[in-house]
Amino acid sequence: MPNENQKPNLYSLFSNGHLQTIWTSIVGKYTLKKTSKFFFTRTRFKTPDNDFLDFDWLVNKKKTESSTLLVLFHGIEGSSDSQYSLAFANIAIENSWSFVVINFRGCSGEINLAPRAYHAGDTEEIDWVLKKIDSIVTADTIFCVGISLGGNALLKWLSMHDRALYSNLSRLKAIAVVSAPLDLVSSGKKLENEVNGIIYSRFFLRTMKKKAKHKWNQFPGLFDLENVICAKTMKQFDNSFTAPVHKFLNVHDYWKKSSSIDEIKFITSHSLIVNAKNDPIVPSFNIKDLNITSENVEYWNPNFGGHVGFSSKINLKKFESQFLWMPRMIGNWFLKTHKTQ
């Protein structure tokens, strides 16, 4: 469990979940792009369905592969350009790790080719990615971190991996998920809140609708385009696009089958679940709700952090703050956990 004494230094104003979320997303990205002295190189891999996935690797100036690789699965409409991707890249550099961000389909700046996109329960995609990585890297140790939607998919995959429903990846030593919507139904309801709908749903839908239009142009009739264009909530979008495109009956079927909350009891691998109590998108869970059965699964529920926020040492005069607090804590947890194995 991360040290409870390691808490972010926040102004009371920024203890608000919305402000934590928005500040980190906007100012964090600007600050990290300005201060980070690294760049990514892209490798494109052909998928089994004749599509492609882009893996963005942190360029290693030492030209030697690290014995440890950190793999990041991003959140909804994220990419290697997201604030948290840049933050974890910095942590990888601090620890001399290799680092790669997996851009989900359609998230690397180019529309994918197949009649599909990405979704919160795509365990087959996670499995294919990790097996591909396992086949091409020489690192002795692999850690994975999943952010929001990517965290839910990663956690659901791990539960299946630990039940031997997917082949064993012996070099995978631990995973961490941050702000993951473990229960998509309750998260969906929270996004339908009037304030959340205005702030977050409209933001996500702006780009998701554009991608959906491109997908319809590729595959006319794949879904009801008019319903997608008219969608005003994530629930409506998932019911009109995500569910039918990925062979779910409807949004309720998609959310129920893709949620990881009922899968956690099957996990035996070293795992850390981090959800802030003031997350405006993901409900805060009581540890009893998660039905954790293994001592290897840890749950941390800090008071502050928002949705993938967790900024600290906020200085309004200089319009800056520290955005590496949570990624650094997770990096330290990976190191500590691996030492005890």
Residue ranges and their predicted role:
Residues 135-139, 143-245:
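Alpha/beta-hydrolase-fold enzymes
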Residues 105-143:
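Catalytic nucleophile-loop/oxyanion-hole region of alpha/beta-hydrolase
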Residues 78-90, 284-285:
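The serine-hydrolase catalytic nucleophile loop
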Residues 66-75:
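Short beta-strand element of the alpha/beta-hydrolase
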Residues 267, 273-275, 279:
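Short beta-strand/loop motif that positions the catalytic acidic residue
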